[in-house]
Amino acid sequence: MNPSARRPKEEPRPRRGAPEETRRRLVAAAAEEFNRLGYEGTDSNRLARAAGYAPGTFYKHFRDKREIFLAVYGEWVDREWEEVSAALEWAGDAAQRAGRIVDLLLAHHRRWSGLRASLRMLTAADPVVREFYRGQRRRQFELLARLRAAAGDPPRSREQDALLLFTLERCADAMAEDEAQTLGLDAAAMRALLVERVTAAL
């Protein structure tokens, strides 16, 4: 018998490609790993292997686990706001568009609840992550203002936008993790109240 036949079959490694593609694969794999295992449940070597690369490849693109986590969160924000922008362009009255926005936010937070839990932990404990998170929040204020301007809606104060975003984000996290249901709250009623809040903001 050929000795090589007894060796475990190795997973095919991804072909060498452009650095941008390698980085994209690393970030995509890291997003799934952070979401599944949590920030503390993995390390840079495991993240590299999850993308199909050797650990050395990871360090060509990221200094450490924290840096790739920040890249993951930045892309998470991009995806969420792309969906919000598309929902605002969708035909329908303000309440219908608001319902669409609330539903996509709830689904997005539910899909990535593990990643969100790690984000909350790190923003409380790590000043670098906290500053990055606040930078993303400032960017969200600008994105919201631009979306309103593009739709021809009147501008609102940053304080009004902050209250809206804080409310949506915290409620979406609570509902994604079944916190509201555990407290005996009606999820449908919570959704309806969020739709009212978003409708008033459009």
Residue ranges and their predicted role:
Residues 1-37, 44-50, 67:
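Basic, helix-initiating cap at the start of DNA-binding domains
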Residues 20-28, 40-41, 52, 60-85, ...:
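An amphipathic alpha-helix adjacent to DNA-recognition modules
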Residues 25, 67, 96, 100, ...:
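Amphipathic alpha-helical interaction segments
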Residues 29-33, 108, 167:
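Short amphipathic alpha-helical elements of helix-turn-helix/winged-helix folds
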Residues 40-41, 153-156:
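Short, charged helix-capping/linker segments at alpha-helix termini
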Residues 56:
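Key DNA-contact positions within bacterial/archaeal DNA-binding proteins
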Residues 78-81, 107-111, 127-152, 159-166, ...:
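Amphipathic alpha-helical packing segments from all-alpha helical-bundle domains
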